[in-house]
Design a protein with these regions (language model features):
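Short phosphate-coordinating micro-motif centered on Lys-Gly-acidic
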Residues: 2, 6-8, 102-192
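Phosphate-binding P-loop
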Residues: 26-31
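Short hydrophobic/aromatic beta-strand immediately N-terminal to the Walker A/P-loop
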Residues: 34-36
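P-loop (Walker A) phosphate-binding loop of NTP-binding proteins
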Residues: 38-40
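N-terminal pre-Walker A segment at the start of P-loop NTPase domains
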Residues: 2-24
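Conserved lysine of the Walker
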Residues: 45
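Conserved nucleotide-sensing/catalytic segment adjacent to the nucleotide-binding pocket
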Residues: 61-66, 71-116
Length: 192
């Protein structure tokens, strides 16, 4: 097994840049890809998944699957569908296996929020994405008193690509696409 690991990080200035990143990411993914999202509440995991769905061209209506654990979003075109999982309440591999993600993995892109340490056994290649608002934000008030405007704060996007699917060429193409989307969104915002 090829355990190629490549990494990069960049700042996402606000939610529109986060959305541009997600859309570019979705456009690069294909059936069989596994994406593990990590970050505190309000870090932008669901926002990133929603825009990733736009890039994949799947049916709208992506919301956090907190209470149902997994939601399926079919493709509107020729591409793969999206399986969106919230693994927060799942304890381990056994709990994950009850969702039977193996049966949809080959035909879909699978995005798992809170999945680190729980879903890596599903495939030998994956993307691990960490979204962190705290790394860039100045301390403000009480964390439980989160104002709506604080949701639009900058966040640090860190991506780790693991396995043979993300060889040097595939990773370089992914990274270039993501950074180009961020740069284009920043340029657009400057001209508005």
């Amino acid at each position: 097994m090829n355990n190629t690991v490549s990494e990069f990080s960049c700042q996402l200035d606000d939610l529109t840049v986060t959305e541009a990143m997600g859309e570019a990411l979705g456009a690069q993914l294909k059936a069989g890809d596994l994406v593990i999202l990590t970050g505190a509440l309000g870090a932008g995991k669901t926002t990133l998944t929603q825009s990733l769905g736009v890039g994949l061209n799947v049916r709208e209506g992506i919301i956090s699957p907190t209470f149902v654990l997994a939601r399926q979003h079919p493709s509107l075109g020729d591409g793969p569908g999206l399986i969106h999982v919230d693994a927060y309440r799942l304890k381990d591999h056994d709990d994950v296996d009850t969702l039977d993600l193996e049966s949809t993995l080959a035909d879909s892109v699978t995005v798992v929020e809170w999945g680190l340490g729980k879903v890596e056994h599903l495939t030998d290649s994956r993307l691990e994405i960490q979204l962190d608002r705290e790394a860039l934000a100045a301390p403000v008030g009480n964390p439980w008193e989160e104002a709506e405007e604080e949701l639009d704060e900058p966040r640090l996007f860190s991506l780790k690509a693991i396995g043979p699917r993300w060889n040097e060429d595939a990773f370089a193409q992914l990274k270039d696409s993501l950074l180009s989307a961020v740069a284009a969104q920043r340029t657009e915002e400057k001209h508005v």
